[in-house]
Each structure stands twice: as C-alpha cells, then as structure tokens.
C-alpha cells in the first residue's frame, strides 16, 4: 500500500534514498486513476519509496514545491528534487523515470 504522507512527516519521508511523491486530491479523477498504477509500481520496484500527499489536507508541501496541477509526481533523491512529471502516467513511463535516477 502506498503511504499517505502528511505535512508533518514530509521532510523525513523524502530525506533518504529515492522517493516518488504523488501530489493528489480526492476529487481529482486522474489522481484516482493513478492510484493502482502506483500500487503496481510499488510492488515491482524496490529501489524507490512511494508516498502520496493530499494537497487539500496538507497544502504546505505542495506550496513548497510549486505544485499547481495534479496529479504531480516529484522524484526526490536524498531529500532533493531530481525530476517531476505532471498528469496521468503509465507504469512503464514511471519505471523509466526512476531508472534514470537510480
């Protein structure tokens, strides 16, 4: 199960290793369609930790990283942003993104 990340634990969650964060909202259709893609990705790729931030419940991380459209996926490496994609993506695209930074 993909972990839900709060504003309070966001910085510690992204601090170490490769971490993919999905910025989403409950009312966002493409965000809902992305959830099973992320769950499948998590089951297949052990080199990345995956988390989700609900921008309505925890807006601070989204504001900090300038997220203006959802879903936005930001890839962090040891706490620093290394890449981002906006919109619904398939699993193969996300695997390529992760492999570029592994």
UniProtKB/Swiss-Prot annotation:
Disulfide bridge map: 28-31
Domain (Thioredoxin): residue spans on this chain: 1-102
Alphabetical UniProt keywords: Disulfide bond, Electron transport, Redox-active center, Transport
Single GO MF descriptor: protein-disulfide reductase activity
Cross-referenced SUPFAM superfamilies: Thioredoxin-like
Gene Ontology terms: cellular component: cytosol
GO biological process annotation, one example: cell redox homeostasis
Family: Belongs to the thioredoxin family.
Summary of the function given for this chain in its UniProt record: Participates in various redox reactions through the reversible oxidation of its active center dithiol to a disulfide and catalyzes dithiol-disulfide exchange reactions.
PANTHER family: GEO12009P1
Alphabetical list of NCBIfam families matching this protein: thioredoxin
Listed name of the protein: Thioredoxin
Organism of provenance: Chlamydia caviae (strain ATCC VR-813 / DSM 19441 / 03DC25 / GPIC)
């Amino acid at each position: 199960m993909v972990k839900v990340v709060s504003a309070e634990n966001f910085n510690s969650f992204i601090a170490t290793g490769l971490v993919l964060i999905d910025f989403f909202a409950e009312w966002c259709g493409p965000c809902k369609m992305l959830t099973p893609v992320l769950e499948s990705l998590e089951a297949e790729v052990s080199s990345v930790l995956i988390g989700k931030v609900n921008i309505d419940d925890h807006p601070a991380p989204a504001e900090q990283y300038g997220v203006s459209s959802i879903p936005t996926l930001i890839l962090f490496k040891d706490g620093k942003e290394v890449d981002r994609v906006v919109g619904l993506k398939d699993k193969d695209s996300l695997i390529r993104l992760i492999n570029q930074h592994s």
